[in-house]
Amino acid sequence: MVKVGVNGFGRIGRLVTRAAFNSGKVDIVAINDPFIDLNYMVYMFQYDSTHGKFHGTVKAENGKLVINGKSISIFQERDPANIKWGDAGAEYVVESTGVFTTMEKAGAHLKGGAKRVIISAPSADAPMFVMGVNHEKYDNSLKIVSNASCTTNCLAPLAKVIHDNFGIVEGLMTTVHAITATQKTVDGPSGKLWRDGRGAAQNIIPASTGAAKAVGKVIPELNGKLTGMAFRVPTPNVSVVDLTCRLEKAAKYDDIKKVVKQASEGPLKGILGYTEDQVVSCDFNSDTHSSTFDAGAGIALNDHFVKLISWYDNEFGYSNRVVDLMVHMASKE
């Protein structure tokens, strides 16, 4: 089992750790966060307003974080180059600070003895992988990779199924997206993105997202055919993608439902879900899929023009894919 270090114990860092313990697929051996001391880590890991209390034991002991009896080394370095991952036995590092997202910055982890780095965010220059879509293109010459964004992980599997079966001529995506930590509780300064600084709990905020364009990086045939935007809405978690696209081959909406359902039960099982239930966002809280197609919510204008709806837990679904990507990478060692 691959030994993993986590840099940044925020929403994704903590939930990747939860996903690792829930699944037993990877071994968390070290955590680095300069802003959270050990006792605070215990508290933050144990109690979660969104996903509930951790079902297991967590305590501080001899300067280590102990989860379900397993000791985890704790570092508090600001500079990733100074983290002694090698000493802790960490082979892979999950870079989940949101700060070190380029090859150069994430590469600093290699200096401390890590063998590979998985960036839990989109990257300007690191190769991006989406499980179920292009993970087979990974080869072990790559030291630094990106797991793309939660929204790309929702959109890409759906876009792949639609494109493989009917061909996407072009498409526009909107994600109606839950609040994240970068937003403000009340109006405040936000650099050049003025709208992003408005109170998160009281506004629908139009925002940019690179998620749709990033699909073109993981599915090259769709490069230049998709773009999109986001609305940030006052919910704490779970988001939904609305993909409106023009199809090359004519398809009835029932044909689309059929191929998505088949994919969800076959090659994309566990990644792409399918539901015909009358669901709302809360129903996907703590769901581990990257994407769940909502058969009842989509509409067709005609046989070539459709609006497709897919839900995702933008925190927990994504965190589970980070774990799955590391398992896949380890299988290639």
Curated annotation (Swiss-Prot):
ISGylated. S-nitrosylation of Cys-150 leads to interaction with SIAH1, followed by translocation to the nucleus S-nitrosylation of Cys-245 is induced by interferon-gamma and LDL(ox) implicating the iNOS-S100A8/9 transnitrosylase complex and seems to prevent interaction with phosphorylated RPL13A and to interfere with GAIT complex activity. A motif ([IL]-x-C-x-x-[DE] motif) lies at residues 243-248. It catalyses: D-glyceraldehyde 3-phosphate + phosphate + NAD(+) = (2R)-3-phospho-glyceroyl phosphate + NADH + H(+); S-nitroso-L-cysteinyl-[GAPDH] + L-cysteinyl-[protein] = L-cysteinyl-[GAPDH] + S-nitroso-L-cysteinyl-[protein]. The modification N6-malonyllysine is found at residues 192, 213. The modification S-(2-succinyl)cysteine is found at residues 150, 245. One of its GO terms (molecular function) is peptidyl-cysteine S-nitrosylase activity. The keyword Lipid metabolism does not apply. It comes from the Eukaryota. The record marks 177 as: Activates thiol group during catalysis. It is found in: Cytoplasm, Cytosol; Cytoplasm, Cytoskeleton; Nucleus. Keywords: Acetylation, ADP-ribosylation, Apoptosis, Cytoplasm, Cytoskeleton, Glycolysis, Immunity, Innate immunity, Isopeptide bond, Methylation, NAD, Nucleus, Oxidoreductase, Phosphoprotein, S-nitrosylation, Transferase, Translation regulation, Ubl conjugation. The modification Cysteine persulfide is found at residue 150. NAD(+) binds at residues 11-12, 33, 78, 120, 314. Residues 1-146 are annotated as: Interaction with WARS1. The modification ADP-ribosylcysteine is found at residue 150. Glyceraldehyde-3-phosphate dehydrogenase activity is inhibited by fumarate, via the formation of S-(2-succinyl)cysteine residues. Pathway: Carbohydrate degradation; glycolysis; pyruvate from D-glyceraldehyde 3-phosphate: step 1/5. The modification Phosphoserine is found at residues 120, 146, 149, 239, 310, 331. There is a cross-link at residue 184 (Glycyl lysine isopeptide (Lys-Gly) (interchain with G-Cter in SUMO2)). Its main location: cytoplasm. InterPro entries: GlycerAld/Erythrose_P_DH, GlycerAld_3-P_DH_AS, GlycerAld_3-P_DH_cat, GlycerAld_3-P_DH_NAD(P)-bd, Glyceraldehyde-3-P_DH_1, NAD(P)-bd_dom_sf. The modification N6-acetyllysine is found at residues 59, 192, 217, 225, 252. Belongs to the glyceraldehyde-3-phosphate dehydrogenase family. This is Glyceraldehyde-3-phosphate dehydrogenase. It comes from Spermophilus citellus (European ground squirrel).
